[in-house]
Each structure stands twice: as structure tokens, then as C-alpha cells.
Amino acid sequence: MKISFLLLALVICSIGWSEAQFTDVKCTASKQCWPVCNQMFGKPNGKCMNGKCRCYS
């Protein structure tokens, strides 16, 4: 029972990973990524991770 729950949780979490798109734009705060993501992918959904913008669809 525990294994099936863990597998289900892994599948649900991995869905979000495939929707993320990395960019080479450097950042220090997530709000710096919003115009970048809006320009590149048409949606302002993004955040700053490890000094680079990561956009979500």
C-alpha cells in the first residue's frame, strides 16, 4: 500500500517537471523572470532558481 502511494506521488510530482522550461537569463529575484517568461513563452509564470529564470506553462 505504501509503495503504490509513493509511486502515485512520484507520477503527480513529475508532471510539473515536464512543463518547466529553462532559460539562460540570469536573475536574483523571481519578479525579474516574469517579463522574460512572458516575452519568450507568452505567459509570465516563472521564478528564479539557482540564478537563472525558469518558466512554467
Curated annotation (Swiss-Prot):
GO MF: ion channel inhibitor activity; potassium channel regulator activity; toxin activity
Cross-referenced Gene3D superfamilies: Knottin, scorpion toxin-like
Identification of the protein by name: Potassium channel toxin alpha-KTx 1.15
A cellular component term, taken from the record's GO annotations: extracellular region
Keyword Mitochondrion: no
UniProt-annotated site: Basic residue of the functional dyad, residues: 47
Residues forming coiled coils: none
Disulphide-bridged cysteine pairs: 27-48, 33-53, 37-55
